[in-house]
Regions:
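Intrinsic disorder/low-complexity segments
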Residues: 1-28, 246-293, 416-428, 496-501
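ATP-dependent carboxylate-amine ligase catalytic core
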Residues: 26-135, 143-169, 179-183
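Structural motif
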Residues: 31, 110-112, 140, 172, ...
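A short helix->loop->beta-strand "cap" motif at the edges of active sites that frequently abuts
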Residues: 137, 194, 368-372
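Internal gly/pro-rich beta-alpha loop/helix module
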Residues: 150-247
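Amide-donor transfer/coupling interface in amidating biosynthetic enzymes
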Residues: 206-249, 253, 283, 287, ...
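Phosphate-binding active sites in nucleotide-utilizing proteins
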Residues: 295-355, 361-366
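Cysteine-nucleophile active-site neighborhood
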Residues: 346-419
């Protein structure tokens, strides 16, 4: 009776909600797409997430592609950690499994797309449209209506008919000037044969002012205000209810093949003690299967370092206990077997990081005595001598700089021919690069530092993105996705030819 009462309550809520009332285990969701970037899909997504949350629904957010910032917005709006879905960095089966796994207890899933709906790394490969079709969920298309009226009709018609396998649930217009303006847009939608779901008025307070929102308490308050305004727009101007989402078929989630018969190098001693430099650092597959109890994995997490994938962190939990710490405010790094320094914006908080000398010294000492460190992008910058003259950890004798900033952007994969594939049939890990900074190396690298350049772009072209080794420290600009391939396997594959393990 209690369960029936709860279901009736949900159905009552949904009678006036954007989501179909027939909720329950295994529900599907919607993908929020757009004709182009900067159409307002993030603003609409935040408003939709908050509006649904305010109605008492459990909403699981997702983000297409490798983006870290939008997932932070999602978490603030929904109260649930957002999950990335990327068909370049992971297989279709893995993406479907992640979509189902993290939304098991949700009433509805909302996926925010990336760029234009059909934009991918190779035509539409890896695009939002590809993910929507893979997951069998309909698309809510956000169209920027600034400076346009009835001319949106052929655009909408084209998106509806370009790929018949893609379901367009309807259109939401953004940057609408007035109700009269909306009347022209609504007529265009009807003539294009696509439902018009509503609109969001042109409001400069709804424009996201920068990509750094959500990183500080002050910025989070600003984000909360923006989300509240967006939710109000959704409540007032988006039609209720929307077409029902597609159900997710209940098929077993394929477990990733992280357990191998061979031993895999992870840089942790089976006893859980800190390995000394030069000692064998192997962990057996049986130990991984047992959960790696006794191993501590410390992850930097604060305003300066927060670019992580939820599925990656859960994969690390398979290897041991995960603990978080703040390089900005904690006195020193925690005792651990593996230190993970993810990306973020250390350049924005360089003074705070520099002022915490005890933390920097503890990380440098950990590296010097053979501690295992894995650092990506902003974490790599933190390990350099300095960021534009502001002192950092000094593990690598490099200077990180934002001077002459140039965007380095793109997917990355390992060059198979250059890597020692000690794990037979293992899927090569992939990742992405996104940064404006650069590192200035000395003319000659000091003894003990190795520089490896064995990464390719999504189209298989060699790139100069490097990976640096010092003792048991592995660092570089690429953000890697190991939730499918496994973190132990990732480190094992970084053993390259002509280098020592």
């Amino acid at each position: 009776m209690v369960k029936e009462s709860q279901e009736n309550e949900i159905k009552s809520i949904c009678n006036n909600t954007i989501i179909d009332p027939s909720l329950g285990e295994g529900r599907g969701g919607y993908l929020i797409g757009a004709a182009t970037s900067n159409s307002g899909k993030t603003t609409f997504t935040m408003g939709l997430l908050r509006a649904l949350r305010d109605r008492g629904l459990k909403v699981q957010p997702y983000k297409c592609g490798p983006d870290y910032i939008d997932t932070m917005f999602h978490e603030i709006a929904s109260g649930r950690e957002s999950v990335n879905l990327d068909t370049y960095m992971a297989s279709d089966e893995h993406v479907k499994g992640v979509f189902k796994r993290y939304g098991e207890d949700a009433d509805v899933r909302i996926v925010e797309g990336v760029m234009g709906l059909f934009d991918g790394y190779d035509k539409s490969k890896g695009s939002s449209a590809e993910i929507a079709m893979l997951l069998n969920i309909p698309v809510i298309l956000v169209v920027n209506a600034k400076s346009v009226a009835y001319s949106v009709a052929p655009l909408i018609y084209g998106f509806k008919h370009f790929n018949p396998k893609l379901k367009i649930a309807g259109v939401v217009f953004n940057m609408v000037a007035s109700e009269n303006h909306f009347s022209f847009l609504k007529q265009a939608c009807e003539d294009a044969g696509v439902p018009c779901l509503g609109y969001m008025l042109r409001n400069h307070d709804l424009i996201i002012p920068g990509r750094h929102l959500g990183l500080t308490i002050e910025a989070r308050e600003e984000t909360e205000e923006l989300i509240g305004l967006a939710a109000k727009e959704v409540e007032e101007h988006v039609g209720w209810p929307l077409p029902p989402p597609s159900p997710v078929e209940r098929e077993p989630i394929r477990e990733r093949e992280q357990i191998k018969e061979d031993k895999v190098s992870i840089g942790l001693s089976p006893s859980g003690s800190l390995p000394t430099e030069g000692s064998p650092m192997l962990i057996t597959s049986e130990y991984v299967k047992s959960g790696g109890r006794g191993h501590l994995i410390a992850i930097a997490k604060d305003s300066a370092f927060n670019f992580t994938y939820r599925a990656n962190i859960d994969a690390l939990r398979e290897l041991g206990e995960v603990i978080f710490f703040s390089p900005q405010s904690d006195e020193r790094m925690p005792d651990c077997d593996l230190l993970y320094l993810p990306g973020g914006y250390p350049e924005l908080f360089a003074s705070d990081l520099a002022n915490n000398a005890s933390m920097r010294d503890s990380i440098k000492a950990f590296a010097e005595r053979g501690g295992r460190i894995f650092a990506e992008c902003g974490g790599f910058m933190y390990l350099c001598n300095d960021i534009d003259g502001i002192p950092m950890c000094g593990v690598f004798p490099f200077s990180a700089t934002m001077m002459d900033a140039k965007l380095h952007l793109g997917y990355r994969q390992l060059a198979k021919d250059n890597c020692q594939l000690s794990i037979i049939n293992s899927q090569l890990p992939k990742g992405h690069e996104f940064h404006y900074s650069s590192v200035i190396e000395p003319d000659t690298l000091p003894e003990g530092i190795r520089k490896e350049q064995f990464q390719l772009s999504a189209k298989g072209q060699a790139v100069d993105t490097a990976l640096y080794h010092y003792k048991n420290v592995l660092a570089g600009y690429t953000h890697w996705y190991w939730a499918e391939t496994g973190f132990a396997e990732l480190l094992d594959l970084f053993k390259c030819k002509d280098t020592e393990a």
